[in-house]
């Protein structure tokens, strides 16, 4: 399974707290179609069996940057609800976190993204829609300052090439199946005409 990354245009906010640097937002949203060459939807049960045992909050998914918060030490909380995966992080007191926090508060950073692997998905040939039904592991959630991506874009860095290849194969299989069904229909029509003449 290859790691995939998705960027979401969701609300990222800093609740008023005079003593702590708190960041909240949705890292994953359910049943919200995103289009990027094909339509993708994350099913509301996709996180039911996901490994979220040690999830860090990062900046732009960068490993070189200090981790901002983490579930392991309870500075990052994850809560699944009917909308998606809600995160609440208490940032530790470092200069880099202070800078990021100020940028979020000023609205300069207002996007979230998540890195994950897929265990189960479905593909609808007619609507060209991929539905992610089972996310295997959540590797990290990130606050990101990428240029604005609207609902027609996804930040994927090419990690979903494997799915795109499989999608092409599935489309080819579907087309072959349709041709076979069309051939059978023509044969049946010819047979019916012949029987009608003989009758």
PLM regions and their residue ranges:
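Polar/acidic, low-complexity leader/linker segments enriched in S/T/G and N/D
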Residues: 1-54, 167-172, 184-189
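A general structural signal for short secondary-structure boundary/capping elements
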Residues: 2-3, 28, 70-76, 135, ...
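Residue microenvironments linked to proteolytic maturation
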Residues: 9-15, 22, 74-173
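Short glycine-rich, polar/acidic loop-and-turn segments at beta strand-coil junctions
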Residues: 27-31, 61-63, 91-93
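Flexible loop/turn segments at secondary-structure boundaries
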Residues: 32-34, 65-66, 121-123
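Short helix/loop capping segments that flank catalytic or ligand/cofactor-binding pockets
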Residues: 34-36, 67, 149-152
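A glycine-rich, hydrophobic loop/mini-helix early in the fold
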Residues: 52-89
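Charged/polar low-complexity intrinsically disordered segments, enriched in acidic residues
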Residues: 158-199
